[in-house]
Amino acid sequence: MIVSLRGTVESIGLGSAVIECNGVGYEVLAAPTTLGRLTRGEQARVLTTMVVREESQTLYGFTDDASRRMFVLLQSVSGLGPKLALAAQSVFTTEDIARHIAGGDAKALQKIPGVGKRMAERMIVDLKDKVVGFNDGIPAAAQPQLSIAVDQAVQEQVLEALVGLGFSEKIALPVLSRVLRDSPELSKSQALRAALSELGTKN
């Protein structure tokens, strides 16, 4: 079982990244929050969990243990597989998922692609008592970071991530600039998610 990877980030795609470790490239599927913390050509460490099927072995990557545990926990719900668990973490932070489930907010959970009313209610029933403590398990680095002005480093890093995801700088920069101007308190991962949301509506 591969539980973590440390190596050079070779490429970043729309939903995955390739990390080379000792000459071997591993494709890791991940949510935008995780991909947004990676930079091509730089060293990175990601926590992983492997999902084994009859014809495939797939690695999923995370920036912190709380996110990885939530990914595994979500799959304990009948009918909720790894793709849906990853979709949940692409829409919400681990903290948000725990809060929506604990609060019985089925309407919020239905914002996850592929989750209807019945699945949302099942998630609440099955996991309401199991998400206690998840908010406390998220490291400070993963919490929203407040700032008074737009951090230039955040803009540069998010722009690089967007270009790595296949968007041209000409298209991505105006969208990202607007996102950060309207919400300068956003962290890198939050800004990436917001920019991807806007860029997605333009396709």
From Swiss-Prot:
GO terms for molecular function: ATP binding; four-way junction DNA binding; four-way junction helicase activity. CDD domains: UBA_RuvA_C. Residues 143-150 are annotated as: Flexible linker. Keywords: Cytoplasm, DNA damage, DNA recombination, DNA repair, DNA-binding. InterPro entries: DNA_helicase_Holl-junc_RuvA_I (IPR013849), NA-bd_OB-fold (IPR012340), RuvA (IPR000085), RuvA_2-like (IPR010994), RuvA_C (IPR011114), RuvA_C_sf (IPR036267). Residues 150-203 are annotated as: Domain III. Residues 1-63 are annotated as: Domain I. It comes from the Bacteria. GO terms for cellular component: cytoplasm; Holliday junction helicase complex; Holliday junction resolvase complex. The RuvA-RuvB-RuvC complex processes Holliday junction (HJ) DNA during genetic recombination and DNA repair, while the RuvA-RuvB complex plays an important role in the rescue of blocked DNA replication forks via replication fork reversal (RFR). RuvA specifically binds to HJ cruciform DNA, conferring on it an open structure. The RuvB hexamer acts as an ATP-dependent pump, pulling dsDNA into and through the RuvAB complex. HJ branch migration allows RuvC to scan DNA until it finds its consensus sequence, where it cleaves and resolves the cruciform DNA. Has three domains with a flexible linker between the domains II and III and assumes an 'L' shape. Domain III is highly mobile and contacts RuvB. Homotetramer. Forms an RuvA(8)-RuvB(12)-Holliday junction (HJ) complex. HJ DNA is sandwiched between 2 RuvA tetramers; dsDNA enters through RuvA and exits via RuvB. An RuvB hexamer assembles on each DNA strand where it exits the tetramer. Each RuvB hexamer is contacted by two RuvA subunits (via domain III) on 2 adjacent RuvB subunits; this complex drives branch migration. In the full resolvosome a probable DNA-RuvA(4)-RuvB(12)-RuvC(2) complex forms which resolves the HJ. Belongs to the RuvA family. This is Holliday junction branch migration complex subunit RuvA. It comes from Corynebacterium diphtheriae (strain ATCC 700971 / NCTC 13129 / Biotype gravis). The lineage of its organism: Bacteria, Bacillati, Actinomycetota, Actinomycetes, Mycobacteriales.
